[in-house]
């Protein structure tokens, strides 16, 4: 390619960049105007239903060479910047920076959102309940290790609702200063340690696992331990300067963690929703079958059901159920009404747009 051809292409790119900036600023001005209207109406800037529509619409417009996923990533940052212009949005997440909850929050809200990392899952709930943050991001379940008990326990008592979900493919790295033969302790969150159990047994059989509040907290511990290592994300390695000596050490390559967005308010139906409920039944034979029968009769698909022991009540359980549909859908509303009559306790945790899990 001739030098002149390169310069012609660069001029073409600069011209399109200028036009893009003008259009983005035009869009931003409209977004600011929308923010004023929302504020006058008492509406929040976070609208997961509308954002889903925008991202789906943009992805459908793609004709290449940019993929639908690339377009979603670009517009996610545009939406993040637009929200920041309307009103600052504070999102609490399990931290410190570089944790998988921090990654999930970035994935959902973009880099223009003010993220507020917290030390524990409970602290995330507290930050939103006490209105120090507008929303929170906490892990709910992992495809390999199952539910996160701390999150389930807080959902029982919190006045907050589930406003959205984020499904994040989890890839673990071993971060350390020294060679593997010198590692005597491996720090990480209990779920991360469990997800890498087989790899650790094969490669670091002498190393003792040490539990921490988060994967990023594990990196901070390992930084001060010459014979220590941490299981964390590649982003955590970049943020804290601890080299990733091994990558992809999770036992199951399809390892996915589901996070939920917690906050006040409710979402309107989208036609592709999920509703989460928590309930307990009377302690008698057939009680669970009778409680779930209305959903089968209405043709409502149950996506997930987990039993959760009730503290201080031996052999009594709470059931966490995800079902297809929105709590305002007629069939779901009628089924929930029937469920309430057949249970000792029922709490609708929220209805929200259903995410597609990473393939």
Language model features with spans:
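Domain-level signature for soluble enzymes in the chorismate/prephenate branch of the shikimate pathway
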Residues: 1-359
């Amino acid at each position: 390619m001739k030098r002149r051809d390169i310069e012609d292409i660069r001029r073409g790119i600069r011209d399109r960049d200028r036009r893009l900036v003008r259009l983005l600023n035009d869009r931003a001005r409209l977004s600011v105007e929308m923010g004023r209207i929302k504020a006058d109406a008492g509406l929040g800037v976070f609208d997961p239903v509308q954002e889903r529509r925008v991202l789906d619409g943009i992805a459908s417009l793609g004709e290449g060479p940019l993929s639908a996923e690339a377009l979603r990533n670009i517009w996610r940052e545009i939406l993040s910047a637009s929200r920041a212009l309307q009103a600052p949005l504070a999102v609490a997440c399990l931290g410190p920076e570089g944790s998988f909850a921090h990654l999930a929050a970035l994935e959902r809200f973009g880099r223009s959102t003010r993220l507020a990392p917290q030390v524990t899952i409970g602290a995330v709930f507290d930050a939103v309940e006490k209105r120090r943050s507008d929303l929170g991001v906490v892990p709910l379940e992992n495809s390999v290790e199952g539910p996160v008990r701390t999150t389930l326990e807080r959902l029982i008592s919190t006045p907050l609702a589930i406003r959205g979900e984020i499904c994040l493919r989890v890839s673990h790295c071993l971060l350390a200063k020294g060679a593997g033969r010198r590692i005597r302790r491996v720090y990480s969150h209990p779920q991360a340690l469990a997800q890498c159990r087989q790899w650790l047994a094969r490669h670091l059989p002498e190393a003792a696992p040490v539990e921490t509040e988060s994967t990023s907290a594990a990196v901070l511990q390992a930084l001060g331990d010459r014979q220590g290592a941490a299981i964390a994300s590649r982003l955590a390695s970049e943020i804290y300067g601890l080299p990733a000596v091994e990558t992809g050490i999770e036992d199951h390559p399809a390892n996915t963690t589901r996070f939920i967005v917690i906050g006040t308010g409710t979402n309107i139906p989208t036609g592709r929703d999920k509703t989460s409920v928590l309930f307990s039944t009377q302690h008698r034979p057939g009680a669970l079958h009778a409680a779930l029968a209305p959903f089968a009769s209405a043709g409502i698909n149950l996506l997930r059901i987990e039993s959760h022991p009730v503290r201080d009540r031996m052999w009594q359980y709470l059931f966490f159920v995800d079902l297809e549909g929105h709590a305002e859908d007629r069939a779901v509303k009628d089924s929930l009404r029937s469920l309430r009559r057949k249970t000792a306790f029922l709490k609708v945790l929220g209805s929200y747009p259903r995410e597609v899990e990473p393939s």
